[in-house]
Amino acid sequence: MILDELKANGIVAVVRGKSIDEARGYMEACLRGGIKSLELTYTIPNVCELIKEYSSHAEALIGVGSVLNGKMASDAIEAGAKYVVSPGYSEEVNEVCKERKVLYLPGCMTVSEIMKAMDAGNKMIKLFPGDVFGAKYVKAIKAPIPHVEIMPTGGVSVDNIDEWFANGVSCVGVGSSLIKGTLEDIENTAKAFVKKMDKIKA
């Protein structure tokens, strides 16, 4: 199951880019650094071409992010996306994913939004923006809803990733704290994230 793979990998790299070539460079740096789950956002021009290119990559678990409507979800799934992430909950996206039997991670902030997403059949939600609430918010949510799987995006860094997991997240989305500097910098940061993740799992 894709959900289990995301949890096992622990880290989802949120990849943005001004062009396919730029995004591809970031992806390769992440893969070299050991991060296998890659969320390619719709802010990348012609992102579906890139999804198609990497959908059968042996090491990569490719998903799509910044999905705002059903057509975007459908096009990305058609290209080979294994999971779909959106900044907020979308009924349209939910229906497409349910129909195509593809994992959907809707963005949620409040407990009411999380309950709505779960009522619609979703097991994992994206807590976004994560840095608004911080890691302790996850523990507070999981007290009354222990079975919800949470992936925070925004505010997760090498320095605080262990705090997020200590408070009960299932995996984390990392973007700007990973995708910065040179490609070598990104690869080294990815390695640092993976090293920290290995310690958390141990």
Language model: regions and residue ranges:
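Aromatic/hydrophobic pocket-lining residues that form π-stacking "cages" and hydrophobic walls in ligand
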Residues: 26, 93, 97, 113, ...
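Conserved beta-strand positions in the central sheet of alpha/beta enzyme cores
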Residues: 39, 63, 85, 105-106, ...
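Catalytic cores of alpha/beta
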Residues: 69-79, 112-120, 137, 156-172
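Glycine-rich phosphate-binding active-site loops on the catalytic face of alpha/beta enzymes
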Residues: 83, 87-93, 127-135, 167-189
